[in-house]
Amino acid sequence: MIVIDDFIKDQQLLDDLKNDKTFFDTKGYMWWDGWWNSPANTIKKRLIQYIWGENSPHPSVNVQGFEYWIGVYSEYEERDELPFHFDKDEYWYNQTKEIVTPVIGTVFYPWENDIDGGYREIYPHGQDGEPERLEPKYNRLVIFPAGAHPHRVTKVTRGTRRAIAINLWDKVPSGLEVGELFLEN
């Protein structure tokens, strides 16, 4: 696992993230085939390119693209926590019961989170082991094997927790073909 605080050094990108009032409005899972195939024409794609392009703290990986989504958890929202899970191609799993996982997972916190709870807990030794517990801290980047280790978000009891999750795939997830992932414009 890699955890880097104050990851983004580009002040313009940080300001653009802070000022984009619609960043967390997008519901559902998105797909981008990467800057080598199509332009980074949205703020989310610019963020992905910043993290996984020239600023990547992780060794280079060969991928087909990026699955990404927004996580908003609050005592006032539909969801106040995220239960134990590991990331996988959900559509493929539901069709075949075969588990296909991403190459690596990413979580980034682009806004301040004045909250109680909402910790990301990663269980590298299984759900019964001790978790690695991470506070949802502004401008923090977390890179971890999202398909290998169970993880969750603990209950938010005050405030709203906001993050973007990004999975890197060496094969396009099957959900794209059936509309479970969409292309962000």
Residue ranges and their predicted role:
Residues 1-141, 148-185:
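Fe(II)/2-oxoglutarate oxygenase catalytic core
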